C-alpha cells in the first residue's frame, strides 16, 4: 500500500446500534429551538461509506476488515462495572444510561464492540505498518 492510499477499516456490525433521536426525545431542552435527530445514525455511516466508494478517491482506498474488540480491550478504557451495566442494559430493550441521551438497545453491544475493535485495527495499522488508516465507525464508541 502506498502512502497515497488510505486504509479504511470497516465492520458491518457498527450499523446495529439505533441511537434514537438523541436527548431531545428524553427531555426536551427549553434552550433548543427545534428538536433534531441524533447525528450518529447508521445512515450517516452508510453515507460516508458510499461517498468513499463512489467519490474521487475511491481508487486510492483499500478496504480492510474490522473486528470486534474483546472485553479485555474495552476494560482498558472502562471499568468492569460499567461494561456490565451496558451489557445488562442491552437485555432490557431500549434504555438510557444514567438518565442521559445515551441509548442502549438490542444491537448496541455488537455495534460498540465492532466499532472499538475496528478502531483498534486502524490504530495498529497506523502505528505498526505506517499506514494512513481510518476506522469507519461511530463516535458513541469514542
Regions found by a protein language model. Give the residues of each.
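HDAC/HDAC-like amidohydrolase catalytic core signature
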Residues: 1-140
